[in-house]
Amino acid sequence: MADQDQTNQQAGSDAPSFNLQRVYLKDLSLEMPNAPHVFLEQEAPQVEVSINVGGQRLAETVFESTVTVTVTTRVNDKVLYLVEGTQAGIFELANIPAEQMDPLLGIVCPTMLYPYLRANVADAITRTSLPALHLAEVNFQALYEQRLAEMAQQQPDAANGNDSGIILPPGATRQ
């Protein structure tokens, strides 16, 4: 009976697990370089948004995933405000097959973090007394696939049959 319990525990320890351990605001900055003059502007602002996903391994099964957004709003070529924020999370990924790690870190983790980042950015902008800006939903799977396509285009060696798996930096050549 004790042997069966030990076998069940060992089998359970080999089971794949994906756990969110912590979500935190890693960085948030807001600049209004042309205040208070921008409050007098009557024209509609132009909004530029860029999003980036990153991450790093913290321990064997522990990873930090980040989503960074930069929002630049201009009126008549003057910056109304600039908001930069990074939302981060610590995730434990144990016994996950290698081919599933990158999609989990590049799609699932950012998808979980993004709502927190949206709320933090919206709150920061609201505190400027300007109209709120609510960031649109992001399809992180499409961004991930786009990144893979860009990497494939930068990898002419892979298309020529060199499947070493080594990703070269731009401009580097294989010896």
Swiss-Prot record:
Phosphoprotein as UniProt keyword: no
Keyword Protein transport: yes
Subcellular location: Cytoplasm
GO cellular component terms, A-Z: cytoplasm
Record-linked InterPro entries: SecB, SecB-like_sf
Domain of life the protein comes from: Bacteria
Listed transmembrane segments: none
Keywords of the record: Chaperone, Cytoplasm, Protein transport, Translocation, Transport
GO molecular function ontology, one term from the record: unfolded protein binding
Sequence ranges of Polar residues compositional bias: 153-163
Any Gene Ontology biological process: protein folding
Record-linked SUPFAM superfamilies: SecB-like
Disordered as annotated region, ranges: 153-175
Principal place of residence: cytoplasm
Protein family per UniProt: Belongs to the SecB family.
HAMAP family attached to this UniProt entry: SecB
Stored PANTHER family: PROTEIN-EXPORT PROTEIN SECB (PTHR36918:SF1), PTHR36918
Subunit structure: Homotetramer, a dimer of dimers. One homotetramer interacts with 1 SecA dimer.
Record function comment: One of the proteins required for the normal export of preproteins out of the cell cytoplasm. It is a molecular chaperone that binds to a subset of precursor proteins, maintaining them in a translocation-competent state. It also specifically binds to its receptor SecA.
Protein name per the record: Protein-export protein SecB
Gene name linked to the record: secB
